[in-house]
Amino acid sequence: MDEEETAEINAQEQEVAGSAGEAAAGPSGAEVQPNDDSVAVERVIDVFEETAEMEAAMIERFFGPSGEVAEEGTLPVPGPSADGEGSANAGGERPSEEDIVLDDGTESDGSYNRPGSDMSLDSPNSEDDSDVEAMPRWMIPQNRLRFAVDMMVSQARNQDGGIAALLNRDNFLQRVRSMVFSQERRRSRNSDEVSPEAEDDELPEHPPPPPPRPPIDIDMEEGVHFDTNLPAEHSYFGPNLNRVPGVNYQEVGSTHHMLIFLHQYILFPGEVLPFMIDGSLFDDDMSGLDGLIFAVAFPLMKPPEDSKKLYGVTCQIYEKGDNGRHLTFYKSRALQRIVINCSDIKGLPQYIARNPTNKCHSKVKILPEYFLPEPLKCIDMGSMSRFRDIPSMRDKYLRYQISSTPWPVEVCQEYAYEDIVERARKKLEVHKIDTMPKCPIQMSFWLVRNLHLTEKMMSQMFLTDSVNLRLQLIGGILKEETLFYCRYCNSSLAYCSDLFAMSKHGVQTQYCNPGGYIHETNTVYRVISHAIGYSGEPSTRFSWFPGYQWHIILCKFCAQHVGWEFKAVEPNLAPKMFYGLAGSSVRIGKAGDSATVNGNNFVVRNMLRVISEGME
């Protein structure tokens, strides 16, 4: 809508107000607004439909007539159904190679300036407090359009400019998107809890899998390769950290009384949890030089059948230091899985990342870890075991062993884990990870952290007491291609095959910012082209990776924070650039996954990507 049309609408508004002013005036002479806003709503809807027609013309340019497929195999165009809901034909073509190239890192295209964003590494605030001020240009779901417009019209009547100001096209689209996405955000946390049956009813067919992408080999980059020991040391806490000795494992099945906190992420035994907290909460409980053991529970993982129980891990502090602001830096390591009865909790538990101020204690029970060795180990003959190390004799030796047992081949293979470990090792070689533990119990947790499973699968892995079952579940997903999706709008961001280890602890590590907020970060070589925008300015302050500057990245569609871009500032440092995706803002899904967020699917997202690029 140009300036002349806006001026004409303003003149019409003034004329209508002048003619109706005397009849509608109150005792003070001020105009009394009518109760029925239907006329104004319809006028705003007309402006939106005018904008939608422009976007539909853009769709027709790329995809053919609205509602029809231009050519066989191309993406269909969604249109309103009879009941007003947006719908789309299933199917679609594979994304082009241009969609899967490396991001060129330019900041002029698709940048979002959000001063004071609380997702910076040096921000003291929580991500849940952020607000979106700018929205990308894409369609609004029809089933929530009228509700958003009703709210806008009622607000606009009490503001300067009235309805005419609402009808400015850019202002209108921005505000409607803001309202709709505020609803999307409130529902996004439950996106992974949609039942498979409901998903199948909504989308009967799966989109096609994405095409293969050219691999990236970090070893081919020139320069000095980054020392992966540095992030594991969490050196951004400063040099004033003192070692706290002592690693204590509690007896399985025993009950202990200890300090407990809550955490928004699932921690597995072996993971490092850095945090910043008031040291007075721990000083009274620390005895001598022994590290304090406390409990961390995960309220978001509470199973429906165990509504009165919390699951978590015990953690032991192994380093601490003062930051000079009445807060203490701590580094702890998760040791064992635990279960807590909610009736045993004394006090109000608080999140460890939200600057807790009160102590909360409870009884915790140490959960067991059952591991059954391979069935053939019990009949292993020492004189012939040497043949297992000869590749040409290994299969013959295995068949000989199986023939001498009462169990069928399927049973032996079901409980054999060496093949699963070998397949996992080969898959992780691509990520440059060579720190796999040898202990089966520790290895099962290590694989869960580094193979990137869905949240539902991770919860299932955590709750099982059988190491063998945990490894079997891991073996079942090794061949699946998975992606990172935006948790808010379901846009694809990056491929899990592009993960690599910037820390010796693996591809997924938790880091803490100066405000005490803990970010679960996944490091990837690259993101899908045109999937991200930028916010704010690059900075090296409090960088988790020494020698790199960080820059906040946002989802290109919904403008929500999804992570950071890291660029080398020191010469000859490799890799030159990589990305850290925030675990709280992304979810893991299969390639071509039909899982939806509020009814928007893979096909619509790829269509909107083209529209967004064209309108910019």
From Swiss-Prot:
Residues 257-482 form the Lon N-terminal domain. One of its GO terms (molecular function) is metal ion binding. Zn(2+) binds at C486, C489, C555, C558. GO terms for biological process: protein ubiquitination. Disulfide bonds: none annotated. Residues 96-107, 194-203 have a biased composition (Acidic residues). Pathway: Protein modification; protein ubiquitination. Coiled coil: none annotated. Residues 481-590 form the CULT domain. Keywords: Metal-binding, Nucleus, Ubl conjugation, Ubl conjugation pathway, Zinc. Substrate recognition component of a DCX (DDB1-CUL4-X-box) E3 protein ligase complex that mediates the ubiquitination and subsequent proteasomal degradation of target proteins. Has an essential role in mediating growth by negatively regulating insulin signaling. It also has a role in maintaining presynaptic function in the neuromuscular junction synapses of third-instar larvae. Belongs to the CRBN family. Likely a component of a DCX (DDB1-CUL4-X-box) protein ligase complex. May interact with pic/DDB1. This is Protein cereblon. It comes from Drosophila pseudoobscura pseudoobscura (Fruit fly).
